[in-house]
């Protein structure tokens, strides 16, 4: 059969079924003007179930092979479509496209040329074009008044009812304000979420919106060019005219990379986490900071190192502890100080040594004690002085069962009272 030689007919009609195609080819049942009555009873008309299955035509940029390309599903019950018959018996129909309009009445499912489910057209979109509101941008939601818009239409002052798309107001209302940055107090620096720069002009904003409310925009409006992907829950990604990107995720976010990931930021990086943050690296971590590192921990710091800790500080180390310091070392402690050590203790010093104590002083050793000085030796005590030995006191008393004092040089004992033995 050569199509057209035995007759060629166009048709226009309304989709009444798109969900029951057993072959799932995107076929639709269409009630056609002039061919089918608007009555749907078996006695006087044609029921929706008895209408032809109409094949959808797809564009040449769609493969329509093995699932490659866009699926031919997009029309809804109540959509006006047009096409042609491929046979003179009017049994093989093809749908070429859809016909938008301005719906005026709610659907009546009992009458043909209507959505049998009585859903489309929606009640809140009557008396306005089928063109998406984001593409039209008739009115700013901040100044929109439904009654005024309806009155203007009723009085013939407007060609249709102007209504804004609800996501503009919802996105503006949900913008995050005064997000705190890291600082030492609540009055530290803050920043705001960058608001949507939506300023579309008809006919430059190319919009695709699904039935549930998912949206994709390619806005070519001069000076307001955007890319926008929006999920019905409020999750979105929007690229602004200046190339900035805003991503907001209403639910959880998972990013899984099976190989490497590289992030290069030429400016600053700010991260604010309202809840907890967990970082787990199963191998090594290398950090290089060319400037300063500041940390402010309002709670506790708990570190557990299973191996060694090595710190190299090229300059000074300053620590200020306002309360107590407790250290427990299970093995040895070795300290090497190449210059001086200065300790100032305002209270007492208590040392308990389970083994021996040995001090080696190359230079002088001086002790200044303003109070009493008591030495208790459980065993023997030996003093060896290579040069002079001088003791000066108001009273000196050496008492013991046996005392030995060996002097290599001179010795001087001076006091008001000196008692030996």
UniProtKB/Swiss-Prot annotation:
InterPro entries: Gp5_OB_N, Gp5_Vgr_C
Cellular component, GO annotation: virus tail, baseplate
SUPFAM superfamilies named among the record's database cross-references: gp5 N-terminal domain-like, Phage fibre proteins
Pfam family, one: Gp5_trimer_C
Keywords: Late protein, Viral baseplate protein, Viral genome ejection through host cell envelope, Viral penetration into host cytoplasm, Viral release from host cell, Viral tail assembly, Viral tail protein, Virion, Virus entry into host cell
Subunit structure: Homotrimer. Interacts with gp27 trimer.
Protein's name according to its UniProt entry: Protein Gp5
Gene for this chain: 5
């Amino acid at each position: 059969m050569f199509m057209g030689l035995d007759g060629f007919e166009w048709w226009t009609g309304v989709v009444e079924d798109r969900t029951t195609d057993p072959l799932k080819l995107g076929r639709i049942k269409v009630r056609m003007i002039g061919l089918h009555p608007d009555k749907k009873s078996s006695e006087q008309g044609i029921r929706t179930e008895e209408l032809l299955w109409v094949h959808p035509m797809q564009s040449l940029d769609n493969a329509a092979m093995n699932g490659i390309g866009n699926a031919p599903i997009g029309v809804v019950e109540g959509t006006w479509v047009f096409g042609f018959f491929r046979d003179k018996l009017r049994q093989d129909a093809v749908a070429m496209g859809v016909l938008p309009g301005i719906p005026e009445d709610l659907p009546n499912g009992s009458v043909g040329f209507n959505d049998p489910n009585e859903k489309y057209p929606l009640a809140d979109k009557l008396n306005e074009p089928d063109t998406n509101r984001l593409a039209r941008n008739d009115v700013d939601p901040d100044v929109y008044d439904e009654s005024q818009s309806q009155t203007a239409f009723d009085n013939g002052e407007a060609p249709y009812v102007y209504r804004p798309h609800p996501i503009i107001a919802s996105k503006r209302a949900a913008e995050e304000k005064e997000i705190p940055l890291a600082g030492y107090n609540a009055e530290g620096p803050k920043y705001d979420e960058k608001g949507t720069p939506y300023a579309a002009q008809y006919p430059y904003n190319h919009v695709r919106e699904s039935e549930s409310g998912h949206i994709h925009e390619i806005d070519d409006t001069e000076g307001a060019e955007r890319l926008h992907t929006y999920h019905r829950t409020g999750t979105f990604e929007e690229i602004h005219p200046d190339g900035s990107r805003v991503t907001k995720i209403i639910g959880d976010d998972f990013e899984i990379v099976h190989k490497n990931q590289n992030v290069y930021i030429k400016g600053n990086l700010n991260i604010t986490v309202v809840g907890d943050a967990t970082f787990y690296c199963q191998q090594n971590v290398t950090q290089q900071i060319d400037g300063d590192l500041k940390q402010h921990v309002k709670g506790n710091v708990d570190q557990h190192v299973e191996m060694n800790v090595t710190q190299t500080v090229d300059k000074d180390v300053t620590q200020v502890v306002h309360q107590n310091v407790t250290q427990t070392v299970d093995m040895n402690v070795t300290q090497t100080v190449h210059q001086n050590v200065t300790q100032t203790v305002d209270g007492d010093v208590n040392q308990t040594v389970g083994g021996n104590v040995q001090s080696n002083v190359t230079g002088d050793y001086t002790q200044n004690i303003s109070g009493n000085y008591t030495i208790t030796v459980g065993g023997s005590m030996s003093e060896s002085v290579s040069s002079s030995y001088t003791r000066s006191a108001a009273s000196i008393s050496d008492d013991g069962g046996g005392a030995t004092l060996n002097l290599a040089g001179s010795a001087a004992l001076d006091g008001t009272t000196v008692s030996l033995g």
